[in-house]
Amino acid sequence: PALAVTIGTLALYRGLALVVIGDQSISDFPKWATSAVTGSFGSTGIPYMAIPVILFVVLFWLLLHKTPYGRGLFALGYSKQAAEFVGIDTKRSRVIALTLSGLMAALAGIYWTLRYSAAKADNVEGLELVVIAAVVFGGVSVFGGRGSIWGSVCGVLTIGVLNYALRLNRIPEVILVLV
């Protein structure tokens, strides 16, 4: 149900964005902000954004695999009744997990907007399903209780590299949608 509610909420906010800005594109962003997400460290080619991404991956890996909260979250995903039976506050755990998920989605939205210097109501439309497919490919169960940060990262990187390779080979967009 959480996934369905999340996608429904996405549709609600996307509709709200259409009402507020219509089909316009907002692109007046400070140069420092766009440079922060598009720049790289000297001639290394390593993007500035690699640092926060690596930090978030490590932080969430530690949270999920090395804390009682994380182990409880896996238990909750596996069986809500069993998690409650062993004393896990399932409502609190869900609220924290969904809040962190929303925060990360907001940061990703800000990144995407600054990366392409355009805020539009239909930015990245359809990307949510690609991301879900990538993390499922990485071993995460949409029903909960199974998965890992590293598996998710591998799934996202695999889908990203595949998509990039197909675009480099000039595969038509109509075919890319099928892949």
Protein language model annotation of sequence segments:
Residues 12, 82-83, 136, 158:
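Hydrophobic/aromatic residues within transmembrane alpha-helices
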Residues 1-9, 154-158, 179:
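Alpha-helical transmembrane segments within multi-pass membrane transporters and channels
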Residues 90-102:
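Start (N-cap) of specific transmembrane helices in multi-pass transporter permeases
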Residues 99, 105, 116-178:
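Transmembrane alpha-helical segments in multi-pass inner-membrane proteins
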Residues 15-16, 57-59, 106, 110-111, ...:
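Alpha-helical transmembrane segments of multipass membrane proteins
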Residues 3-67, 72, 93-95, 115-124, ...:
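Transmembrane helix-bundle core of multi-pass membrane transporters
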